[in-house]
Regions:
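Nucleotide-activated chemistry modules centered on ATP-dependent adenylation/adenylyltransferase
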Residues: 2-180
Length: 180
């Protein structure tokens, strides 16, 4: 109990804010280096292998010889294109790592049996909860930092994305090194 309290004090919204202020104008490489140095071995890198942001982060970590100090993971929803798997396999070969797949507890058939067909159309929040949110929570369990490819130019809701923020839901630091 005492150890958990000390850990909660060490990494909290308050001191993450201080670190975020220090790194707000830093390069992606500097942010990645600082985060890996401070939070490894509990650093997770989410990568969809379907867009450029995650690929850039994996490439940067590899060039900085930091890839072996993080867990690169992806959410295998059961609906990924074969081209996405091809990109992942090529990245794994090129950089010598193996990405961890996190999958929903329900197969697509089980989901349809329990919730009916086309859940994504009728209740997208429930569908994403099953296929993305729950597997992502599993991936982040016990981690201290989560590196994402989120960029401020991706949507109106992401315009104010900080370089570092405390994520209360997962109790870790969420990192956006490519924010600008």
């Amino acid at each position: 109990m005492f150890y958990e309290s000390v850990l909660a004090i060490e990494v909290s919204e308050v001191n993450v804010g201080d670190m975020a202020s220090e790194l707000e104008s830093a390069s992606a490489e500097t942010v990645l280096r600082e985060v890996v140095e401070r939070f490894s071995p509990g650093v997770a890198v989410s990568c969809s292998f379907g867009g450029p942001s995650g690929l850039v982060i994996v490439d940067q970590l590899a060039r900085m010889n930091l890839l072996d100090r993080v867990e690169v993971y992806y959410l295998d929803t059961g609906l990924l294109f074969s081209a996405t798997h091809d990109v992942r396999e090529e990245m794994e070969r090129r950089y010598g790592f193996e990405a961890t797949a996190y999958r929903p507890q329900l197969s697509l058939v089980q989901q349809a049996s329990l919730h009916g067909n086309d859940l994504w159309d009728r209740d997208p929040d429930e569908c994403c909860g099953i296929r993305k949110v729950a597997p992502n929570a599993e991936a982040l369990g016990g981690k201290s930092a989560w590196i994402t490819g989120i960029r401020r130019d991706q949507s109106v809701g992401r315009e104010e994305t900080p370089v570092l923020a405390w994520n209360a839901r997962f109790r870790l630091v969420k990192v956006a090194p490519l924010r600008d």
